[in-house]
Curated annotation (Swiss-Prot):
The keyword Protein transport does not apply. Keywords: Chromatin regulator, Coiled coil, Nucleus, Repeat, Repressor, Transcription, Transcription regulation. Residues 136-187, 327-378 form the SANT domain. Residues 29-42 have a biased composition (Low complexity). One of its GO terms (cellular component) is transcription regulator complex. The gene is rcor1. Residues 1-53, 190-262 are annotated as: Disordered. Expressed in territories in which neurogenesis takes place. GO terms for biological process: chromatin organization; negative regulation of DNA-templated transcription; regulation of transcription by RNA polymerase II. This is REST corepressor 1. It holds the Pfam family ELM2.
């Protein structure tokens, strides 16, 4: 790690100890040349910036390991909190499945999912149940942030305080860190740096162009050439004399960036936002708050749907009204007799439907009622009315049926009903 104090002391040592340069050899001379290059390049960028620090004077002095110092450091109160520690009891397959569910279903990233698992002491069931209770913090760099960074970089180059105006929720340290990770995904010839210098030269003029190229890194201004066209550069020719304008059409096509589908960014909107720092901060903060609010709504809807799905997994049997299981009763009350006649008027000879209407009488008992109480309630006339409305069917071909009597279902009737049934029973004629 390069410390700031060591860097400052290294600068002073490189400038003031010119008389003692023999002991350092060519390293000190090389470091002085790098200092000159960094000072010239920092004139174009922000104050405090510079080139690469190369040389012995820029290296940190690593002290010897001291157990007492290490012990005192571990006993500090402001130590960081451990968020994940692997456990041998959890297999890799289960861990991958847990992370996949946390990512796809709940929107967690890997670090957040593992932190939740570590909080519950590597209990996957408890962790999965607790994932619904929290809304994961959104990713630090979303797709929208990356597109805005590319657009801001195309306008302002490596002037990070201007880029911050378009991304007010990002610190300059975060912008610089993302810039170097983003830079690695681009061409090795540093197309971004060349594009940034081209934009700055167009704004500041040719005078600043010479000043910038003198302090730039030779690796950054190297242009892409075919392998057969590459030749060694003579010592007298300096790299800054190489011009980038040899392929203007290719540079224009290379500089074009298209945002993802569904996103657009007009130059008028960017200029309006960049005109005033306060206005840009307010507008972007409102948009960011709306985005976070929408994400929270989506997460709440997901949690609600998941809760409903869990409730429906057991089926609807728990919510179904339990039907009172009524036992069949052999006695016919007055209300049941009238209800049976009305059911015959409505359903005809559909004994099953009549049994369902009455509730506590079986199909056999309904058939017995049909035969026993035929004359008493004038059931034949009721059937004729039903047939007049619905027509005569195959089921209604016979007007009489014998009562079904089973020994195990023998019916004990009251004296009154038994006497009435004996008088009313009729048997079909021999014809």
């Amino acid at each position: 790690m390069i410390e700031k104090g060591a860097e400052i002391s290294g600068k002073r040592r490189g400038r003031n100890n010119a008389a003692n340069s023999k002991s350092l050899g060519t390293n000190v001379n090389g470091s002085n040349s790098w200092e000159e290059g960094s000072s010239s390049s920092s004139s174009d960028d922000e104050p405090g910036g510079g080139g690469m620090r190369v040389g012995l004077q820029y290296q940190a002095v690593v002290p010897e390991f001291d157990q007492e110092v290490a012990k005192n450091c571990q006993e500090r109160e402001n130590l960081g909190m451990l968020v994940w520690s692997p456990n041998q009891n959890i297999s890799e397959a289960k861990l991958d499945e847990y992370i996949s569910v946390a990512k796809e279903k709940h929107g967690y990233n890997m670090e957040q999912a593992l932190g939740m698992l570590f909080w519950h002491k590597h209990n996957i069931e408890k962790s999965l149940a607790d994932l619904l209770n929290f809304t994961p913090f959104p990713d630090e760099w979303t797709v929208e942030d990356r597109v805005l960074f590319e657009q801001a970089f195309s306008f302002h180059g490596k002037t990070f305080h201007r880029i911050q105006q378009m991304l007010p929720d990002k610190s300059i340290a975060s912008l610089v860190k993302f810039y170097y990770s983003w830079k690695k995904t681009r061409s090795k010839t540093s197309v971004m740096d060349r594009h940034a210098r081209k934009q700055k030269r167009e704004r500041e003029g040719s005078g600043d162009e010479i000043e910038e190229t003198n302090g730039a890194n030779p690796v950054d201004i190297e242009i892409e050439q075919p392998k057969e066209a590459k030749k060694e550069v003579p010592k007298n020719d300096t790299v800054p004399h190489i011009k980038k304008e040899k392929h203007p059409s290719q540079a224009k096509n290379r500089a074009k960036r298209k945002p993802p589908n569904g996103m657009f960014l007009s130059q008028e909107d960017v200029e309006a936002v960049s005109a005033n720092a306060n206005a840009a901060t307010t507008v972007l903060r409102q948009l960011d708050m709306e985005l976070v609010s929408i994400k929270r709504q989506i997460q709440n809807i997901k949690q609600t749907n998941s809760a409903f799905k869990e409730k429906l997994q057991g089926g609807i049997e728990d919510y179904r009204i339990q039907e009172v299981s009524q036992k069949f009763n052999a006695r016919w009350t007055t209300e049941e007799q009238l209800l049976a006649v009305q059911a015959i008027r409505m359903y005809g000879r559909d004994f099953q439907a009549i049994s369902d209407v009455i509730g506590n009488k079986s199909v056999v008992q309904v058939k017995n009622f049909f035969v026993n109480y035929r004359r008493r309630f004038n059931i034949d006339q009721v059937l004729q009315e039903w047939e007049a409305e619905h027509g005569k069917t195959e089921e209604n071909g016979d007007c009489t049926e014998k009562a079904v009597k089973l020994p195990e279902t023998a019916i004990k009737m009251s004296d009154e009903e038994e006497e009435a049934s004996l008088l009313d029973i009729t048997y079909p004629s021999a014809s």
